[in-house]
Amino acid sequence: MYGNYLDDAAKIVAAKREENLKFEHARLTAEQKDDLLLKFHPDRIKKQFTELKIGPNKGQQAPIELAEMLQAKPRLEPEKIDLNHIDYETDVLVIGGGGAGTSAAIMASEAGAKVLLVTKLRVGDANTMMAEGGIQAADKPNDSPAQHYLDAFGGGHFDGKPELVYTLVNKAPSVIKWLNDLGVEFDKMPDGTMVTTHGGGTSRKRMHACKDYSGAEIMRTLRDETFNRADQITVVDFTAAIEIIKNEKGEAAGAVLMNIETGEIRIAKAKVVIIATGGAGRMHYQGFPTSNHYGATADGLVIAYRAGAKLLYQDSLQYHPTGAAYPTQILGKLVTEKVRSLGAKLINKDGEVYIHPLETRDVNASGIIREVREGRGVHNDVQDAVWLDTPMIDMIHGEGTILKSIPAMYNMFIKYGIDIRKEPILVYPTLHYQNGGVEIDKTCHTNVAYLLVAGEASGGVHGTNRLMGNSLLDVVVFGREAGIEAGKMFKKIKLSDNLSLKHVKDFEKERTAAKIKGNAVSPKILPTYHHGNPEFEKEIPGATL
């Protein structure tokens, strides 16, 4: 029970549940989708974006908050950094300890490389751990990578780089087998066949899941495998990369590292550098809550951009349609799309089903925003929202389905007295995914030599909208590809003796010439929740070095 004014609002949903269960809302036409996105999607609000004045993407648009970080003062002063004092020397430097970073480290070590994995929090503190619904792969008789390609490419508004989408879908079946062999406990039938379900925008049931703990289970397995390779993979945690180091040829040759607890600086020299730092939800674009982990602050984009790497679709973000909108304690937390794939429908305050629950994420997010703005949302003290009618799931599939299939969702709400088996829940879009990022090719190369990028920090895989289940797939497919590529490269590259931060000095000159204003410092490293108290800006040691 909600135990307040929302109980009466929930009764309207309950009264129409049987009727709504039988009602199937028509899919929107292409024209209807375009109109809805144009009017209500946050990415279409021009005043929330600004033109980049410096860097490889000069003249292009970016969210105001991201532009500030991309063009901010560097956290270090190059002349104060001693590049002759090397703390770590390695074949492959992996920056980031999520699904992409660990996959890359594992595959590079498989090729015989000595790997240094640095992460500003701990291995596994990543958006991979937060993912719930599942991972896509076309490995059933009625499906194919070609069909998966059509869904993913179309779902991304045909903006994805074809070679990246091709790699994503064709590597998917082998990635599922690899994860299964490593020990990921996928949902299976009694005969061992993997259970698959639909997601928004999928034409076939190809979603493989581990109940609704899919990301956590995959991350657990990758983390264990990483630590099991301690003879080849050295992990340094609570350490952020704050600048890429180059050599005299302009090739990536390592990174400046900073311990986030002490501010201590360390220099890592490497033959190949892989950025796998994840997303940017903790930038809270346009004030949206986020489903992202605490360290998602766009650091990888900042250090890559300053090193000269081009970005792609940096102006495209994904707002997951169903973030928790009540109670306050879980505002913005992800309500997995699996809830809708199991049959729960989106309902407005009048008890009406106003959209198909499995439209693509950008369309459903826009639909929720429309309902709220036009007065058909449910008013509450936390965030005006719409209902997600979860009791429909047990009605469709039988009592006990919720506890069996989405226990994480049940546990998240029951601690606040809301039983999703009996009561609907309130949802509103939450900042969930960075569609764009550093532009890569199919083997994760950027335009900066020896600098690879994988996972959510990259751009081009999903175009300008991502389908459910393709992010977990992305981090493993391209994390592996980056590791495999680095495993080939390191054997042909010599460690450089001429390390340089000249590109940082050049960036400062460009910044001065463009008359960039403000005192922001980047990379951000951790979000700042100072509630108006600027003293909290000093919480990271060595704010400038």
Give short role names for the model-derived ranges.
Residues 53-67, 242-258, 405-458:
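A glycine-rich dinucleotide-binding beta-alpha-beta segment and adjacent secondary-structure elements
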Residues 41-44, 48-62, 69, 73, ...:
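Conserved redox-cofactor binding core of oxidoreductases
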Residues 1-2, 74-75, 80-90, 99, ...:
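Glycine- and aromatic-enriched mobile tails/lids
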Residues 1-91:
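Extreme N-terminal leader/targeting segments of oxidoreductases
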Residues 92-95, 267-278, 452:
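Short hydrophobic core segments
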Residues 137-168:
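Glycine-rich active-site loop/strand segments that organize a redox cofactor
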